[in-house]
């Protein structure tokens, strides 16, 4: 009775409680109580708290909250993927500039850093000082640059590792002219961390220095132009009388550069050059040096672009004009891969009468004084003018839209657990995890995640799935930490101690030495007599056997064999068991998988609903519940078998390892080698058996979880037992027969299972919990539980067939394989028999005194009465009459 009261209280506690300040339920009728208690829904198994978060690479380095609270020592799983990432177009800022001191056009390249949102430059052959950004007072720009001339030449010839823009097959290349009048404008950062401040001053200096680098061409508002014209045509426009800027006439005309700016690609002052550019027009197609009148080239003309040596734009080809930005562009899909090259077939050769090549200067002048004298005294009048520049934005997109393996490898995910929910600083270190991480939480707290991405050209969102165990761990802690681990640790120690005693035993030592001597002697005699064919494999095999037995005799043999051989079996059991388990409470506890199972099958809501169904004796639900409960008890016994099977396998493994010295010696001779092979097979069988047993067990558990939820049905507050008072006086000759219900107590209220009646619409479907579906599901649940209970015997046979190890047999029953687990379970059953009988005693009394007792009832016809027992004779009919009827 106490048990029944406890179950009723449990069910009532699971119902929706009334509010503390609402006393309306006290005056409610039975129908009103239904809205208060509501319904008990079938629970879902949620031993894990799961979540999903998308982390944008734009927030890389910042911690993101998951909202999950984790517990120390319990499982934490994190699984993430880079499937949602795509590469940003590789973006470059390219400055193509004509400088007659170089045999090829100057090409400055900046790479766009998406993380910093700016173009950044690296690799320029600048110079540094003790105070970067400040030119020393005893030095001038020309003197500082003089020592770097050879580096400049190598830089533009790509001889010092200066990388070109790389293009892969299938890449989409988009080149557009940029509205930039300065290679170092504010949006591209003049002082990136990879470049000295002084370099920016060097490239932008307005001071003439023949040895310095420049990015300006003094084009002013006329950017993205190239001028390639004879001195005669230029002078005819700016100095037709040859009064100040020019000398000579006809083909002998020379442009006299007073400031020597033409030598560095700046032939005129800004105002003069802008005035000149305003007086000339764009060159017609196929113009050349002697175009008359002088003109300029625009829209990319005068420049040749190649990819991997293949020309994608020739010199006279124009970019397509963009009506929106008025800047030209070109679009190309690469059919071949390689480096992108910007060049021209126009050469500055013959522009000056003196030597103007920086490569010649770096070879011919060993000191700055001689060089400065040469520049000062030289005649730098030009025979033609060739100057100008193009600023371009180059974007290269991946045709397959996938990130490279290298970029993918650089992206990492970290997790952090904090004691409170305060946002951690970005400088707080985290723990890096792989794509499928599984481990125990190092502490209690809240889970945070962040992405670290050193690749600035990758965009998108990383999808992260995470889960942590929230159920109890008491069972696995008791079973593993309290019982199994002490046993396995002791047997590890016993195995090592017994091994040492065997190896140190003089008798074993003598046997091993004698066996080695006989083996070598017999081998030598057979070889001398020609009875043995020696092959390389045979020689290696025999040397290997001798070496192994020789190591066995050494004091450090345990360390050698344990580290290289035994540990594979000892650790193999735990390794395979841990890796085949999916849901577990703890990664460090190999029996953690039992905790989610016990959380499922000991759920209070489940047992409360089972008790509610148990009260439904009149419609047969009680029979279904009895089958379910008995099935669960059978399943719990199967869990115990799995645990015992693991312990026995581990003990058997340690015992076999402790006997290793005997069996290792036996591998020398063919007659005894079979015993050694059988020993190896037994070791494998002890490793494989728990693994296969777990796999089968967990598969069945998945099915059982689904079936159990189908056996249990939703229960709502209703009338459990209707109370109807009836009066029938017809037997007394009074024609009075009526019945009525009490208005204040129409029945005994309680939770009632919601089982629909079988109809023509649901008789052939199993999506509704009709009585037919519940009964068949209960039988299936019972069948699966019986299947799990017989797993140990089945797996023993399977492992025996795999490893060729014959299972041990019971004495007197040599045709039936047995296993120690079955014997242990029988012993446990015999010990628990008295407890089982005592527990069933109340049930027997209930059956004898209540179910089987005589009871009176009105005979359906004729008014007779009868009493009887179930499956017994009727008491209202005499035995003689029964025999006569038969």
From Swiss-Prot:
Residues 1-20 form the signal peptide. It holds the Pfam family TrbL. It is found in: Cell membrane. Residues 856-886 are annotated as: Disordered. GO terms for cellular component: plasma membrane. Its main location: membrane. The chain crosses the membrane at residues 520-540, 609-629, 647-667, 680-700, 779-799. GO terms for biological process: protein secretion by the type IV secretion system. InterPro entries: Conjugal_tfr_TrbL/VirB6. It is a multi-pass membrane protein. Keywords: Cell membrane, Membrane, Signal, Transmembrane, Transmembrane helix. Belongs to the TrbL/VirB6 family. This is Uncharacterized protein RBE_1262. It comes from Rickettsia bellii (strain RML369-C).
């Amino acid at each position: 009775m106490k048990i029944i009261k406890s179950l009723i209280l449990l069910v009532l506690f699971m119902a929706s409680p009334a509010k503390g300040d609402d006393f309306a339920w006290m005056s409610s009728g039975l129908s009103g109580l239904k809205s208060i208690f509501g319904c008990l829904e079938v629970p879902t198994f949620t031993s894990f708290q799961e979540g999903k978060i998308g982390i944008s690479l734009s927030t890389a380095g910042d911690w993101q909250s998951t909202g999950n609270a984790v517990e120390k020592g319990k499982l934490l799983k994190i699984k993430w993927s880079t499937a949602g990432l795509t590469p940003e177009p590789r973006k470059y800022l390219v400055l193509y500039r004509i400088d007659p001191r170089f045999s090829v056009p100057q090409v400055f390249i900046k790479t766009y850093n998406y993380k910093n949102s700016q173009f950044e430059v690296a690799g320029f052959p600048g110079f540094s000082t003790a105070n970067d950004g400040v030119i020393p007072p005893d030095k001038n720009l020309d003197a500082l640059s003089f020592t770097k001339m050879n580096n400049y030449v190598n830089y533009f010839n790509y001889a010092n590792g200066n990388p070109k823009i790389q293009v892969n097959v299938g890449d989409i290349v988009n080149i557009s002219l940029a509205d930039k009048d300065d290679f170092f404008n504010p949006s591209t950062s003049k002082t990136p961390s990879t470049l000295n401040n002084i370099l920016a001053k060097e490239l932008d200096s307005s001071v003439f220095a023949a040895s310095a680098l420049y990015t300006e061409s003094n084009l002013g508002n006329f950017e993205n132009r190239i001028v390639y014209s004879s001195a005669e045509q230029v002078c005819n426009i700016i100095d037709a009388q040859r009064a100040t800027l020019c000398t000579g006439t006809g083909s002998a005309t020379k442009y006299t550069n007073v400031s020597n700016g033409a030598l560095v690609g700046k032939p005129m002052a800004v105002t003069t050059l802008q005035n000149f550019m305003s007086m000339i027009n764009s060159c017609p197609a196929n113009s050349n040096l002697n175009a008359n009148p002088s003109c300029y080239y625009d829209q990319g003309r005068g420049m040749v672009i190649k990819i991997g040596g293949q020309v994608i734009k020739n010199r006279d080809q124009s970019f397509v004009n963009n009506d929106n930005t008025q800047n030209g562009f070109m679009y190309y899909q690469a059919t071949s891969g390689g480096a992108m090259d910007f060049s021209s077939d126009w050469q500055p050769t013959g522009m000056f009468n003196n030597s103007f090549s920086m490569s010649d200067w770096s070879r011919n002048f060993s000191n700055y004084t001689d060089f400065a004298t040469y520049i000062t005294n030289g005649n730098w009048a030009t025979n033609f003018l060739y100057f100008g520049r193009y600023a371009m934005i180059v974007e290269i997109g991946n045709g397959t839209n996938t990130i490279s393996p290298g970029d993918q490898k650089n992206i990492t995910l970290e997790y952090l657990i904090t004691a409170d929910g305060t946002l951690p600083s970005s400088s707080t270190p985290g723990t890096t995890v792989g794509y499928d991480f599984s481990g125990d939480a190092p502490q209690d707290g809240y889970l945070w995640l962040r992405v670290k991405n050193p690749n600035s050209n990758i965009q998108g969102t990383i999808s992260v799935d995470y889960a942590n165990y929230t159920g109890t761990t008491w069972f696995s802690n008791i079973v593993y930490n309290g019982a199994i681990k002490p046993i396995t640790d002791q047997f590890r120690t016993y195995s090592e101690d017994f091994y040492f005693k065997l190896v140190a035993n003089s008798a074993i030592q003598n046997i091993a030495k004698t066996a080695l001597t006989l083996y070598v002697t017999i081998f030598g005699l057979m070889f001398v007599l020609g009875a043995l064919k020696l092959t390389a494999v045979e020689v290696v095999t025999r040397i290997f056997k001798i070496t192994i037995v020789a190591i066995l005799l050494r004091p450090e043999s345990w360390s050698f064999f344990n580290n290289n051989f035994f540990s594979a079996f000892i650790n193999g059991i735990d390794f395979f068991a841990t890796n085949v388990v999916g849901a577990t409470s703890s990664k460090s506890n190999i029996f953690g998988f039992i905790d989610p199972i016990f959380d499922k099958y000991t759920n209070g809501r489940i047992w409360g609903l089972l008790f509610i169904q148990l009260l439904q004796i009149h419609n047969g639900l009680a029979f279904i519940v009895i089958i379910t409960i008995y099935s669960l008890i059978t399943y719990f016994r199967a869990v115990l078998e799995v645990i015992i099977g693991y312990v026995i396998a581990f003990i058997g493994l340690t015992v076999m390892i402790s006997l290793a010295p005997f069996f290792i010696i036996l591998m020398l001779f063919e007659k005894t080698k079979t015993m050694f092979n059988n020993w190896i097979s037994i070791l494998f069988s002890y490793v494989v058996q728990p693994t296969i047993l777990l796999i089968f067990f967990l598969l069945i558990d998945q099915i059982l979880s689904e079936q159990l939820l189908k056996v249990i049905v939703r229960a709502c507050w209703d009338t459990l037992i209707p109370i109807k008072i009836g009066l029938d006086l017809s037997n007394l000759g009074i024609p009075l027969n009526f019945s009525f219900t009490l208005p204040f107590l129409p029945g005994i209220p309680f939770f009632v299972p919601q089982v629909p009646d079988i109809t023509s619409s649901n008789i052939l479907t199993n999506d509704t919990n009709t009585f037919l579906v519940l009964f068949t599901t209960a039988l299936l649940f019972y069948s699966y539980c019986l299947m799990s209970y017989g797993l140990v015997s089945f797996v023993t046979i399977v492992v025996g067939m795999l490893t060729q190890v014959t299972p041990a047999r019971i004495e007197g029953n040599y045709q039936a394989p047995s296993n120690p687990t079955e014997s242990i379970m029988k012993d446990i059953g015999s010990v628990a028999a008295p407890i089982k009988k005592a527990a069933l005693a109340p049930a027997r009394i209930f059956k004898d005194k209540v179910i089987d007792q005589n009871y009176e009832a009105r005979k359906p016809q004729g008014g007779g009465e009868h009493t009887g027992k179930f499956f017994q004779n009727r008491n209202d009919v005499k035995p003689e009459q029964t025999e006569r009827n038969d």
